């Protein structure tokens, strides 16, 4: 995934910023408490495809 894209993408649920996961497989929205998968280098930013963050993930800075 192109890291420049992170500067312009926003969470479709809360409109907040997104963070790339450490393993680079998800875009994380702390504001909405969800993670969107990245498939073949393309973020899938559909609410139906997002997974809910665990409590530990929400608290992780």
Swiss-Prot record:
Among the entry's GO cellular component annotations, what is one?
cytosol
Provide the family line.
Belongs to the UPF0434 family.
Identify the Gene3D superfamilies for this entry: 2.20.25.10
Please give the superkingdom of this protein's source. Bacteria
Question: Which protein, by its recorded name, is this?
Answer: UPF0434 protein Pmen_1615
Q: Quote the InterPro entries the UniProt record gives.
A: Trm112-like
Which organism was this protein described from?
A: Ectopseudomonas mendocina (strain ymp)
HAMAP family, A to Z: UPF0434 (MF_01187)
Q: Which SUPFAM superfamilies does the record cross-reference, listed alphabetically?
A: Trm112p-like
